[in-house]
């Protein structure tokens, strides 16, 4: 039955209405509605479905649908069918299946979309028919695209410091579709993938993690979509740099070559220099301070001494010293010889020709001498046999302890039976002994000689004077050797920083008064038959170039003992102060020694010693004791391992003793906490006419790279006026930490309002930035107050620089030998040198003591070095006596039991 063409739209409308009621018109996805009983495989299948589109300006958009198999396809927009005349239809046949294919297109204009009001959006959907049923496509939404002109938030100009973060916010204009945002830096696109220092947040803000100088620019936020591209106002970002001070230059040379003057130092605002409007550095770029340059004093000879007695070689001599005055502060040395000899004649002078009478006289004298020697030999043998058991094991330790008697550094008295003294003289070689001493030995010695005799030869109980038996030529050679050897001639005799003396196998001690520096020469350290003139010298840091690497610092004075190259059979002990706070976690300490070529070498790393080392150092809180068999120039150097490494500084305040002007200077010294540094400043202030006005304090200075600051406060303005231009003064960290600069100080100049003002009350603060500090409360009368002068008087007391023989030791020689003989052999019951070391708290390096022929001698030598002259012999005696059983029978233990 044929249907008229005019009826097709009506029939199609009826069918579509019924279908939409059954399936719903708001489905957005493809929906199939098969006819009951039909083949579902022949339902329409969409090859192309309509998609969401935007209308740009007034251009219509095209929607396309394509389905197979399909007999009809119609569009429905917002629930209404699109007129058939608005469809553009193309029919074809699928080449693979032979099924009919249909493609339909429609145009949607801006006016059609704008007719929809409210919240509903304009949408379109395709419906396709086949003999098996219908299928609906997904919905396609048609929106009008736009982008408003005004940004909701624009970036603002900023000024930021270097390495500070930057955030530039941007909220783009409203638009459909939503606008994409990008940033321009001076019209160049910012790409976060190429610059990890920047990124763009989800809210479109531009973030610079750390501002750089290159980030100074104009920044623009750009928003764009398919409709338009909008630019925000440009925001100027300026990255500025605040100025920073460079390090201070070294202090200039004092303006006065001799006496008081000024010196200055400067710094510049270039670390870094201010840029882009950054702040300039605060503070002064120039500092001035008062200085005092010591005037050089040329040396001058003292008067000649009297001529010595005419010697056997028909010569006598006289001497003089370069001490009237001694050269100092760079003055010239005396020129000429210090020793003068000339021929002489006297009864003692030997003549070349002798008559027969002289020959007979000489033969008689020789015969008498031989008889006396034989008689003396017999007496010695008898005496030693009676005393044969003297060196056997002592049955009672009271014999040991009773022998401990205090030894004074004053001349020996005649009532001490254990004291053996030697007083060498360059003109004669006479040695005086007092007492009865007999050591253990295989056989009695036939005679005693200064050059090769035994220390404890059997002598009577009386007083004996023994003359050296060497020929006259040897004595003459000895005198000439002392006057001509280079090291002896170069010694600065008479100075306060040196000690020297003549020593033999008996040993002795050299001390530089008020410095804490001494050299202990134990018995038998000098080979028997040798006589050495040994010196001990304290050097000023500016006179000796000690190279320091990295964070190294000088902790001790630089000390020389010599002459170098002399043969020693036992280690000597060099004692000197140090200013470090010992801590193995904070310091790496090294003992340095200058080689013959002048270079400095690390001869010992403290904490890494081994018994094979030639050197050993006993380090204590304020002093170190160096064992060495090679004399030379030494210094203790430390390298900080952490900021906890600390040096002790001693702070001293000096002011003039007499003040004749209105100005009054307070000098604050910052020294190493060592006796030698204190001595140097005291001597300097005595020359400047200064006095100590406060008790010294100790400040702990850390390796934190922070400077030391000094300031004065609470100065009564009605009486005094401070002339300090800044709030505080600074001593640079490296000037202190290096340790090689002397006389580090700052001067505070006050001016009296009235010449009659004499009372001064103020406060002086000294502190390390972010570290330790000290405060001085000054309250005294500048014309009458001398209460602190006694401290300097005590510090300036001198001592005997050289002690020779047993007078240099606290422990009597015989008792010392008994201790060594008894404690050197190992003992299973603990009565040996190891236990003694523990009792004396010297057991940190037992391996070093064990490597020596006599460990006990090393321990006693160290005890002597640590405790002279004020050591408590009673405590040592108690330690020795306590080694045995409770009955104090230490030496009753036989060798078989050990």
Curated annotation (Swiss-Prot):
Write out the PTM section of this UniProt entry: Phosphorylated on cytoplasmic tyrosine residues. Phosphorylated by PKC in vitro.
Q: Where is this site: Cleavage?
A: 396-397
Ranges in the topological domain labelled Extracellular: 26-361
InterPro entries given for it? Answer: DEATH-like_dom_sf (IPR011029), Death_dom (IPR000488), Death_UNC5A (IPR042155), Ig-like_dom (IPR007110), Ig-like_dom_sf (IPR036179), Ig-like_fold (IPR013783), Ig_I-set (IPR013098), Ig_sub (IPR003599)
**Which residue ranges does the record annotate as region Interaction with DCC?**
661-679
Glycosylation: which residues? 107, 218, 245, 248, 251, 301, 304, 343
The alphabetized UniProt keywords are: Apoptosis, Cell membrane, Cell projection, Developmental protein, Disulfide bond, Glycoprotein, Immunoglobulin domain, Membrane, Phosphoprotein, Receptor, Repeat, Signal, Transmembrane, Transmembrane helix
What are the annotated disulfide bridges?
A: 65-126, 77-124, 170-221, 254-291, 258-295, 269-281, 310-344, 314-349, 322-334
Annotated Gene Ontology cellular components are:
cytosol; membrane raft; neuron projection membrane; neuronal cell body membrane; plasma membrane
Spans through the membrane? 362-382
Subcellular location per the Swiss-Prot or TrEMBL entry:
Cell membrane; Membrane raft; Cell projection, Neuron projection
Q: What residues does the Ig-like domain cover?
A: 44-141
In this protein, which residues make up the domain named ZU5? 497-640
Q: Name one GO molecular function term.
A: netrin receptor activity
Record's signal peptide: 1-25
Comment block on domains: The ZU5 domain mediates the interaction with MAGED1, which participates in the induction of apoptosis.
**Name of the protein this chain belongs to:** Netrin receptor UNC5A
In its UniProt entry, the species of origin is given as: Mus musculus
Traced from the root, the source organism's taxonomic lineage reads: Eukaryota, Metazoa, Chordata, Craniata, Vertebrata
């Amino acid at each position: 039955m044929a249907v008229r063409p005019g009826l097709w739209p009506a029939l199609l409308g009826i069918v579509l209405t019924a279908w939409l009621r059954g399936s719903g018109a708001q489905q957005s996805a493809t929906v199939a509605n098969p006819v009951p009983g039909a083949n579902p495989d022949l339902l329409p299948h969409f090859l192309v479905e309509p998609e969401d589109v935007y209308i740009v300006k007034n251009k219509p958009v095209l929607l396309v649908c394509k389905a197979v198999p399909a007999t009809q396809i119609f569009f429905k927009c917002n629930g209404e069918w699109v007129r058939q005349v608005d469809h553009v239809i193309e029919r074809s046949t699928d080449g693979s299946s032979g099924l009919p294919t249909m493609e339909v297109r429609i145009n949607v204009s801006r006016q059609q979309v704008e007719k929809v009001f409210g919240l509903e959006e304009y949408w379109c959907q395709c419906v396709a028919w086949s003999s098996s049923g219908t299928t609906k496509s997904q919905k396609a939404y048609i929106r009008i695209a736009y982008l408003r002109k005004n940004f909701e938030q624009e970036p603002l100009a900023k000024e930021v410091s270097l390495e500070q973060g930057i955030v530039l916010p941007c909220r783009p204009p409203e638009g459909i579709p939503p606008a994409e945002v990008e940033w321009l830096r001076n019209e160049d696109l910012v790409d976060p993938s190429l610059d990890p220092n920047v990124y763009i947040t989800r809210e479109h803000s531009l973030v610079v993690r750390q501002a750089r100088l290159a980030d100074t620019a104009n920044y623009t936020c750009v928003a764009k979509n398919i409709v338009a591209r909008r630019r925000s106002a440009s925001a100027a970002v300026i990255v500025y740099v605040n100025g920073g001070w460079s390090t201070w230059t070294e202090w200039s040379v004092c303006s006065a070559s001799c006496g008081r003057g000024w010196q200055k130092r400067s710094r510049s605002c270039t670390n870094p220099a201010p840029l882009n409007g950054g702040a300039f550095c605060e503070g002064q770029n120039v500092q001035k301070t008062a200085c005092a340059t010591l005037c050089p004093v040329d040396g001058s000879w003292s008067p000649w001494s009297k001529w010595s007695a005419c010697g056997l070689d028909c010569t006598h001599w006289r001497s003089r010293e370069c001490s009237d005055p001694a050269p100092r502060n760079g003055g010239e040395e005396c020129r000429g010889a210090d020793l003068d000899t000339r021929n002489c004649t006297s009864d003692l002078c030997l003549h070349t020709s002798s008559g027969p009478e002289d020959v007979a006289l000489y033969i008689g004298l020789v015969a008498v001498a031989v008889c006396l020697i034989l008689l003396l030999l017999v007496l010695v043998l008898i005496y030693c046999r009676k005393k044969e058991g003297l060196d056997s094991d002592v049955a009672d330790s009271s014999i040991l302890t009773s022998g401990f008697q205090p030894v004074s550094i004053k001349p020996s008295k005649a009532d001490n039976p254990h004291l053996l003294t030697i007083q060498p003289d360059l003109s004669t070689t006479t040695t005086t002994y007092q007492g009865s001493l007999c050591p253990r030995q295989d056989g009695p010695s036939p005679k005693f000689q200064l050059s090769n005799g035994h220390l404890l030869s059997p002598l009577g109980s009386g007083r004996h004077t023994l003359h050296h038996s060497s020929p006259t030529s040897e004595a003459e050679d000895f005198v000439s050797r002392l006057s001509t050897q280079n090291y002896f001639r170069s010694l600065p005799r008479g100075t306060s920083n040196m000690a020297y003396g003549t020593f033999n196998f008996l040993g002795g001690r050299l001390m530089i008064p008020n410095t804490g520096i001494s050299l202990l020469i134990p018995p038998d350290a000098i080979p028997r038959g040798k006589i050495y003139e040994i010196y001990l010298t304290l050097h000023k840091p500016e006179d000796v170039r000690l190279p320091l690497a990295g964070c190294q610092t000088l902790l001790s004075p630089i000390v020389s003992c010599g002459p170098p190259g002399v043969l020693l059979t036992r280690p000597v002990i060099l004692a000197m102060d140090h200013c470090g706070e010992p801590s193995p976690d904070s310091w790496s300490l090294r003992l340095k020694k200058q080689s013959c070529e002048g270079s400095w070498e690390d001869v010992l790393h403290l904490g890494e010693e081994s018994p094979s080392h030639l050197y050993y150092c006993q380090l204590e809180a304020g002093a170190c004791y160096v064992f060495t068999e090679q004399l030379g120039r030494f210094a203790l150097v430390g390298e900080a391992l952490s900021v906890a490494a600390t040096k002790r500084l001693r702070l001293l305040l000096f002011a003039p003793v007499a003040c004749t002007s209105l100005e009054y200077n307070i000098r604050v010294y910052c020294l190493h906490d060592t006796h030698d540094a204190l001595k140097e400043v005291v001597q300097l202030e005595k020359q400047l006419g200064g006095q100590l006005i406060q008790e010294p304090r100790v400040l702990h200075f850390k390796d934190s790279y922070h400077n030391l600051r000094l300031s004065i406060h609470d100065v009564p303005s009605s009486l005094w006026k401070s002339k300090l231009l800044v709030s505080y003064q600074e001593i640079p960290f490296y000037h202190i930490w290096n340790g090689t600069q002397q006389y580090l100080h700052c001067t505070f100049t006050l001016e009296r309002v009235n010449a009659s003002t004499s009372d001064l009350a103020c406060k002086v603060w000294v502190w390390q930035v972010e570290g330790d500090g000290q405060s001085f409360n000054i309250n005294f009368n500048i014309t009458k107050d001398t209460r602190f002068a006694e401290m300097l008087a005590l510090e300036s007391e001198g001592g005997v620089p050289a002690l020779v023989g047993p007078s240099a030791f606290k422990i009597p020689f015989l008792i010392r030998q008994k201790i060594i003989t008894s404690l050197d052999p190992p003992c299973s019951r603990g009565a040996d040198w190891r236990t003694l070391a523990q009792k004396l708290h010297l057991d940190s390096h037992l391996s070093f003591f064990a490597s020596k022929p006599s460990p006990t001698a090393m321990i006693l030598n160290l005890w002597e070095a640590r405790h002279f002259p004020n050591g408590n012999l009673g405590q040592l005696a108690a330690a020795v006596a306590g080694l045995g059983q409770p009955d104090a029978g230490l030496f009753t233990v036989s060798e078989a039991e050990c």
